[in-house]
């Protein structure tokens, strides 16, 4: 018999469906797997006017946010009210695991100021690219970097998803230790009929008997799109 205590874990993320990105998918995978047989996981994420949380068989706690009407569909978390911090404390979590070093990590920082709960931060993406590209003034960029770094430094453990992400951590000023913790997302296995394949090919004018490469992700250079294009060009030149 396994006598180990099953933990109650907060899975913090700034993005969750209907907003879809890599972090959103990882947060779903964590919640599904933990709730299946490892313990209890509750997703902590900003409110979204298009949320359909009834579709999930685990608890999702939504906190106040500001909605940005954009193609990405992101909400900006606003975790500043004391009652929001008390809500997390009242849930009696054993661990706070943030997958976003911005609003939700700051939320967890405020909670820990009132009640000490172990925290883990997984650093997924290269925020310096987004800051440098989207934040218009140096003063605002400096504030964004300080905010990001303070949230990272506040965690008891910092995880990265690959060795390559460590360079980004160092660029934003983090000098502490880290753990490389690879992750992945389970995808359902489906059987697609020959008729369905033929229909899709006709719809998108895809010729038969040629290799098909599909990229799913944000159209931004640091996602290695240039590498993909160069590789495709090399294959074309080689016939």
Give the location of each predicted region.
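A structural motif in glycosyltransferase catalytic domains
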Residues: 27, 34, 213, 228-229
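N-terminal subdomain of nucleotide-sugar transferases
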Residues: 1-64, 88-89
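Carbohydrate-associated surface elements
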Residues: 47, 164, 184
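Conserved donor-binding/catalytic core segment of Leloir-type glycosyltransferases
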Residues: 207-223, 229-232
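Short beta-strand->alpha-helix junction loop in the catalytic core
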Residues: 182-191
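An aromatic- and histidine-rich active-site surface loop
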Residues: 95-128
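Nucleotide-sugar donor phosphate/pyrophosphate-binding loop at the beta->alpha transition
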Residues: 118-120, 128-150, 196
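A short helix/loop element that forms part of the nucleotide-sugar donor recognition site in Leloir-type
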Residues: 191-206
